[in-house]
Amino acid sequence: MKQVPGYTLVRTEDCPEQHGTLTVLTHDVSGATILLVENEDNNKAFGIGFGTFPSDDTGVFHILEHSVLAGSEKYPVTSPFLQLLKSSMASFLNAMTFPDKTVYPFATPNETDFRNLMDVYLNAVFCPLAMVDRAVFEQEGWHRDADGTVSGVVYNEMQGALATPDAQLQNALERAMFPDTAYGFVSGGDPESIQALTYEKYQRVYRRHYSADNCCITLYGKMDMAEKLEMLDRDYLSRMPRTTTRPRLTVQDEQPGTCVELPYYTENPEPDEVQCALAWYTGAFADRERQLGVEILLDALLGTNNSPLKAALLAEKLGADIDMGFDDSTLQPTLELVLRGATEESARKFAPAVRKAVDDVLARGIPQELLLASLNSAEFASLERPGSLPDGVLDAINASTGWLHTGDPALLLHTDKLFASLRSKMADGWFDELLRSLFAPAPVQVLQVPTLPKKQEETQAPARTDAKLVLDHPLTVADLGEGAPSAAGQTEQVAGATVLRHPSAGSLYLNFYYDLGHVAPEDLPYLDLLTDVLDELDTPTHTAQQLNTLRSTWLGDSRVLLDFWTGRQEGAPCHAKLTMSLSLLERSLQKAVELGGEWLYDTQLTGPAAEAAFARVLSQQKLNMEQQFIQQGNAYAAVRASAHYNVENAASERCSGVSYYHFLCDLLEKADWAGLGAKLETLRAQVLQHAQLTVSLHGSEQALDTLRTLLPGSRFAAQERDAAQPYAEPLTPPVNEAFIIDGGVNYAVQVWPMERRSDRKVLARVMSYEYLWHNIREVGGAYGTGMLSSDGVEYLYTYRDPHLTESYDTFAKGPAELAARDYTEKDLNDLIVGAVAKLDTPRKPRAEARELDRQYFCGITEAMKAADRKALCAVDAARLKEQAAGLADAMAAGVKVTFGSRDAVEAAGSLFDRVETL
């Protein structure tokens, strides 16, 4: 690009990985580093990241992350971030505290929105009111009330975040590995230490770290870069001279052989719930080839239960599961292995068992086909960039990471040459030597033993008020446009299956949908279990490990799952599907059909190997669900409560909720693995041989031609299949339930049935952002709260909430308050813009493929989507007040479900008809 006044050009380079050009600049006055990623992506992104290095466990940088978004000089309102959530078209809007940096990114497809958001973010980080308003610190960080109780948004968030044994184990491991550097501290904050943070220290830390020469700014996508740089210089950077000393990270002397023991407090300590973590340093961050090699090596040796190293360790029967973790984003990357579900005696044998297993792998040599499969899989993922984060947000985070550790914000955006180099080294023993060097030092070790819990304190927080955010160029409903139509699909019959094709370029997405309308409700959990055990099972021609290797070699991603979808019309049926979802390059289509058929049809569900796999997988699933109840209790409560009101949620709860947890516990207690295998075999045959099959292809016309020739000779061909039918099951009467979990926080949910009306999404946004945010989050101290309206139900929820009864009382008062409010034209405009923007959020190709398939099965047409959009845009004050007035009766007919602490549940008394300890 052309030279822009005020900046020094460091370099410009082509970047095929980003489909565009990278430009690195330094701002002359402030010393800020800027990365421009210029390409044709309309989902434009911005990010500003600061190096933030904790020196204690007070969570000061986490509190600052929250605080700077709570009002600034140009936008002097309590929560501009909240008001942006209401009225922006952003596809991503957030901030993140990492162990060594804090990043403020957003993405939006709208140019006016981009300029507004960029100015709000820059004013927030460089001119926050929190530096002169102590109330912000107390609200977002911590405060003590007159009765001595402690609260605050971050304080309460971290009580929940650190409630799980995994979080406590991780923090202890990091302290043991990094006793002398920033990485040894809890960057999010430990509740026991947060109270030691003073307002004066908070101010000092901000001034030292939130300087322009300690930041990296990223601009990504299709935009006028020169215009954005001029705004940066004119309004912010030119006013910020360089500081004398920029904060720096220090390197930790490695700590091999360190051993730590710690308790984990739980309501029901069991001798077989011990965990043991082992960790090693993996080399220098700047050596990106080595770190990518570590990632590939670990996936090859530990990626599945049948991978050589993990299989050998599981065979020792030291515990129920072994997890692997690898973090290459820090100055000193690390890997860790965690043994779960062990006894104290077996946990102490873990380190020697790892040493022996590594030596055995080295003695035999690492199988080349495993390395190739893992390398191919990693390379496909780097091209596809799966997940929900917009590409520009990922680039902003990666730019901040590379800049922080090497001074080069573009370092992590180049990967093609790394993959090529590693591919050339596969046959020369490079990976064997890498494995040897990784595990040669004695590991850092942490042993975690369960014991009875400490008593938790009750907490609460004070009330605050708010004003309206005034933007230079606010969005209006007129800016929204008509919405882009989805690509039209075409169907045809091939080999007894319906083939649905949507045109797309790039990677192929191939989905096989088997109708489950004929399946009895009590059999659904078995099918869900089937989707989880397929990776563990042999076929007549391949071992499980061989088949996993082939799938990784030829496919980008492959998974089997259950889908439950319901249309938008009132009384619309539920469509239940057993789904195999594959992503691949077009040249691999034949292999995809062959491998997918073998994997789905030929895995052996009976015999000793299958029975051992069942016991292993069920134990692992049970452990994982117990962790998730503590971390995501609101999600489990919502699906549990919603199951009383529609079939889709009833099926989801049966296959992924508390009912499924009970199903797992029952199977583990019975341990009839032969009977389980026979049951799964019968169900699989019933579905795969007889259920209607729809094959969805998102790809080119040429790929469709190839698929037409492949299906008739494949396992998916059938002469005759049953007609599809809606899935149905009887709904159970509503019951108010509480589930007691470990930890000092609660998740309160209230659900009620409601007709499907798109315009109620505006009401949900008013409730979420005008009422609940203030009363539950700011006053009550919960980390999260909101209202959702979808799928024939509506619900209110809290997340990591110090309260329970008080939150339900707040829920009950909401309808009257919303009905009594006056809504200005600007209020309605902002709410409608935010609601409609959710319809236009850009999706990545895989997500777009799945959404188009959902629309096909549910009969969702362009006319329906246009009608939804029109209804949202037509909401007026009278309609909103009418909906709010009717909400109280609707809520009263609903149900309450809570996941929470014993103290809170017992204090709630008569709120619940049934209480269970999980």
What do the predicted segments below correspond to?
Residues 427-454:
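Extended, domain-scale alpha-helical bundle/helix-rich regions
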